[in-house]
């Protein structure tokens, strides 16, 4: 992969509104979004987003003000987000699985002036979740749809009508003043290791990084991109609809992952591009009616975000017919992508690594003293490059702890670089547990357990043990719901891995607890394990 060529794009196209204007000049009549059988062209998307920007300006939003979005994957999400950017604002996406108190905390800490949120979703009327919790800094709550209860201030149509209070000229002047290095979004990390922190990222790195990403993974002009990854996550936002718009592709939003619905939509809409975490594809592969669907339109996919079992790449190619499968690695603090495999990489490389550094990115692995380790040696993954975050919002201490004086981002992930510069992530530093003095990395054990013929999904956690300090517990979801023979499973483990890696406990579950991004929630899983183990006799 070559270095990013900033000169290939004019400076005016290195802001998100500028990028959209550039794409509209080339693909004005092409479908940008298809939802419920209705199409929004690129020209219409720009028109709607500028109306949304004018409405926000009429509500008092100034350049640099934060505007929050709390909704599933809907066309209005994209319109509103583009509107925030076109008003010079900073987008604050909120996870739809958050409870009211969690959302209120982020709204208060970000001092969001306006919230655009879904109405009825997941058995909740979302504005009601903020009853008694709404921060005083939150001036307006706009609810999508028509239903306006007292907890909301206006619906989407009423909001868009506010555009009349600001002229098109004033909005375009605001848009023209946006600079590529202005903050575009404030994304709060998932909080799997503590209280969520707000990651600030600018326009320029998002555009350059995901232009490079798109060119490699096979997202092209005219691709039909089914976005299951939530828009509030970088995988659904930046590697999702932003990347699609950059390339002149068509976005097909999907609100909730359901294997039956996804398979049907791939067939009916002739979807060609479908990224997602491993759990998405494992769920599709486990669908009993998989062979009844015509998936021949699927050409390309990208996976990552958690452990990728080598067998999964093979099954995606052979059973789903996706020939162009690549893997990638990134985190919110680096804009969502740092390394990437290429289509020309062999199956073993794609299955066992997450690729090499994006153009303009440096990757190294270091020991506990911060010294670089050699090829094949494990160490903490450090990243440096143009797309590293601007910092954590109003948290200098956390920023300094994460980005060192030389500009290296300390990821907290453990990885290995090979002689070619390809990265393999082995685990999270904080997920590691120690069995009798031996370091155990759950992702490494999960990778091996995924090769067991009866395992569909697996996650490993460490639990306290009086004799060994900690021992492993494997939580298994079997293929087609077969009952796992635990003695035979343990015997298989002993034959395939070092004895200290063999799980002491095996729990068969109907499903693993995941968040809206389909990442396994290890803290929730650990609680399930503790509850289950407390009720059964422990082995000697």
Swiss-Prot record:
Keywords in alphabetical order: ATP-binding, Cholesterol metabolism, Ligase, Lipid metabolism, Nucleotide-binding, Steroid metabolism, Sterol metabolism
GO-annotated biological processes: cholesterol metabolic process; fatty acid metabolic process
GO molecular function, one term: medium-chain fatty acid-CoA ligase activity
Residues that, per the record, bind ATP: 189-197, 413, 428, 519
Catalytic EC class: ligase
Gene disruption phenotype: Cells lacking this gene accumulate 9,17-dioxo-1,2,3,4,10,19-hexanorandrostan-5-oic acid (HIP) when incubated with 1,4-androstadiene-3,17-dione (ADD).
KW Transport (keyword) present: no
Catalytic reaction equation(s): 3-[(3aS,4S,7aS)-7a-methyl-1,5-dioxo-octahydro-1H-inden-4-yl]propanoate + ATP + CoA = 3-[(3aS,4S,7aS)-7a-methyl-1,5-dioxo-octahydro-1H-inden-4-yl]propanoyl-CoA + AMP + diphosphate
Highest taxon of the lineage: Bacteria
EC number(s) from the headed UniProt entry: 6.2.1.41
One Pfam entry name: AMP-binding_C
Family recorded in the similarity comment: Belongs to the ATP-dependent AMP-binding enzyme family.
Function statement: Involved in the catabolism of the rings C and D of cholesterol. Catalyzes the ATP-dependent CoA thioesterification of 3aalpha-H-4alpha(3'-propanoate)-7abeta-methylhexahydro-1,5-indanedione (HIP) to yield HIP-CoA.
Protein's name in the database: 3-[(3aS,4S,7aS)-7a-methyl-1,5-dioxo-octahydro-1H-inden-4-yl]propanoyl:CoA ligase
